[in-house]
Amino acid sequence: IPIIRPLNSSLTADEIDEITGILNGTTNYMLSKMFYEGADYDTVLKEAQANGYAERNPEADVEGYDACRKIAILSSLISGQQVDFEDIYCEGITKITVEDMKYAKAMGTTIKLLASSRRYAGNRLHAIVAPCMLYPEHPLYNVNDVFNAIFVHGNVLGDCLLYTSDAA
């Protein structure tokens, strides 16, 4: 998603206080298949690899490390301070089961791997990467398949959603 240039140029007068996104198309593809088709993790991983979405060693994607590195970069940009990805809590999708997806559906939610960074008073920052349950009202709820999206909130911008496919 082309977000770095806007953060460095178009949005420099804006104080960005939140960036939340689906930053990895591979994991979003896998979770979409699990949710809509009822497929299990191992099956969708093999399918993602066969389609060229997942690497032979998918650890960086499925453990959330790729999304974690990306949110660390974005966190650094919005805060003006160095954010090390190793300081961010990171949980991937390897423990998500078919049963989890059934419960999410029963509750009227879906499960997405979100990377989120939020600024608080005093330029304090909180960032996390983890599977989250989203209700249909959430702007990232309908981002499926290999698509990525970033929700940005700023004091001048308000809410903005950037959306693209990016898993190949």
Explain the meaning of each model-derived region.
Residues Y163-A168:
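Conserved small/polar residues in nucleotide/adenosyl-binding loops
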Residues P2-A54, Y65-D66:
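Rossmann-like NAD(P)H-binding beta-loop-alpha module
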Residues G21-N24, A130, H153:
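Short beta-strand segments
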Residues V44-N142, F147-A149:
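Substrate-binding/catalytic subdomain of NAD(P)-dependent oxidoreductase enzymes
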